[in-house]
Amino acid sequence: MPENIAFLTNSTDLGHVGRALGSSARPAWAIAVLASVLIFTTVVDVLGNLLVIISVFRNRKLRNAGNVFVVSLAFADLVVAFYPYPLVLYAIFHDGWSLGETQCKISGFLMGLSVIGSVFNITGIAINRYCYICHSFAYGRLYSFRNTLLLVALIWALTVLAILPNFFVGSLSYDPRVYSCTFTQTASSSYTVVVVVVHFLVPIAVVTFCYLRIWVLVIQVRRKVKSEERSRVRPSDLRNFVTMFVVFVLFAICWAPLNLIGLVVAINPEVMAPRVPEWLFVVSYFMAYFNSCLNAIIYGLLNRNFRKEYVRIMTAVWIPRRFVTETSRAATDGMRSKPSPAINNNE
């Protein structure tokens, strides 16, 4: 009980700080824009990623071992939409945090779970693409349905382990500038550097290596005259690769500013933190938030099977009987089909 009272007092202080630093200085239109962006992000996040998961479940062409990574990534994006984002909206509308320490810690934990889970799943997808295109002979053995489930389980186990140190470092707290309980970059300079390197730079390096190797192979194959070399990379495989490459690029663009700010602040928190313009910090955070709703849109724009399934699902919503019938038929069709790579057989 005393801890809750102390936290509420601190939260009140933070609320005053937030009003001093930004909330009172921000015009009503700025707050309305932030709320509108987050509402849009949350709605599209929920609807889009549910469409992804249902599409994989319903469509035999999408239902394969490799697409487990895609579903896992969709789940990571859904985590923030169901809990942290609504609490951020609550803080925006109430100009501060009044939900207590427990809610703050849970929100910060789930935010981290979603972010790191997304990074690790995107890395897993890149490695999957690399193995399928560059090491196709070993792919079937490496990515059996059982092995894929184990790899996804490993990804989430590593994600949880990566978040746990935050509770010991004390880096999860309410930041009034972004109305969110989140990772505090000024809690520990060394820990901030480790977080940026391990949770962002290393995965980005791994994904970049995988996709560069794929691009090199694609270029080499296109220059070959032999038919057997050209057939190694089918047009559908290339389109699928481009889809996931776009997902990666958008993730990197949305999260790079915030991670760069973290590295700059870590150099000397007391000196550098006040020099970071508040508008830049807020924009970088909301760019990161916005990324959670983009993947489902990319699948729909660049992938014909996902696009068709989206239309079928949205149409069937108006005819519930048809939806139930088609879903039941899909659930019993092709469940034991040969495992294939992420978004394989899609156009």
Swiss-Prot record:
It is a multi-pass membrane protein. GO terms for molecular function: G protein-coupled receptor activity; melatonin receptor activity. High affinity receptor for melatonin. The activity of this receptor is mediated by pertussis toxin sensitive G proteins that inhibits adenylate cyclase activity. GO terms for biological process: G protein-coupled receptor signaling pathway; rhythmic process. It is found in: Cell membrane. It comes from the Eukaryota. Glycans are attached at N10. It holds the Pfam family 7tm_1. Residues 1-36, 94-105, 170-191, 266-278 are extracellular. The keyword Glycoprotein applies. Belongs to the G-protein coupled receptor 1 family. Keywords: Biological rhythms, Cell membrane, Disulfide bond, G-protein coupled receptor, Glycoprotein, Membrane, Receptor, Transducer, Transmembrane, Transmembrane helix. The chain crosses the membrane at residues 37-57, 73-93, 106-126, 149-169, 192-212, 245-265, 279-299. GO terms for cellular component: plasma membrane. Its main location: membrane. Disulfide bonds join C104-C181. Coiled coil: none annotated. Induction: By cocaine, which increases the levels of day-time expression. This is Melatonin receptor type 1B-B. Residues 58-72, 127-148, 213-244, 300-347 are cytoplasmic.
